[in-house]
Amino acid sequence: MRKIYATGKRKTAIAKVWLTPGKGELSINEQSLNQWLGGHEAIKMKVMQPLLLTKQEQSVDIKAVVFGGGYSAQAEALRHGISKALNAYDIVFRAILKPKGLLTRDSRVVERKKYGKRKARRSPQFSKR
C-alpha cells in the first residue's frame, strides 16, 4: 500500500496531503469535510474537483493538514495538494488535471505596502488648495 505525500499552496495557506488507496474517506485537520467546511457547498466543490474529474472520490483516502490563510485559500491549497498527489499516484491523471490548471500553483499574493502611500497603491488624499 503506497502512501503519497504532496503539498499544495495558495496565498499564505499551506496544505499537506497524504493520499492512500482506500474507500473515499476525507480527513482534513482530523475532521470530516463537512465538519471542516461548516456547510459551504461552493468550497466543497472546489476541494472535490480533482477527485470528481479523475473519478477517484470512492477509491482513495485523503488525510490533510491545512493551516494559514482563510477558508477559501485553504480550500484552494487543498485542491492543489490533492491534484499533485493524484498526479504522483497515476501519471494518466496529468492529462485530465493539467488542462484545467489544477497542477499549477496560483502565484497571486498580496502586494506589499509602499512608503508614502496608505496601502499598496492607495495614495493619500490630494488637495489643490
UniProtKB/Swiss-Prot annotation:
> Which HAMAP family does this chain map to?
Ribosomal_uS9_B
Q: Which GO terms describe its biological process?
A: translation
Q: What is stated as this protein's family in its record?
A: Belongs to the universal ribosomal protein uS9 family.
- Which cellular component terms (GO) are annotated to the entry? cytosolic small ribosomal subunit
Write down the species.
Helicobacter acinonychis (strain Sheeba)
Instruction: State the UniProt keywords alphabetically.
Output: Ribonucleoprotein, Ribosomal protein
Quote the PROSITE patterns the UniProt record gives.
RIBOSOMAL_S9
Give the protein's recorded name.
Small ribosomal subunit protein uS9
UniProt cross-references to InterPro entries, sorted A to Z: Ribosomal_Su5_D2-typ_SF, Ribosomal_uS9, Ribosomal_uS9_bac/plastid, Ribosomal_uS9_CS, Ribsml_uS5_D2-typ_fold_subgr
What's a Gene Ontology MF term here?
structural constituent of ribosome
Question: What Pfam family does this protein match (any one)?
Answer: Ribosomal_S9
Q: Which segments of the protein form a coiled coil according to its record?
A: none
The answer to whether the entry has keyword Nuclease is no
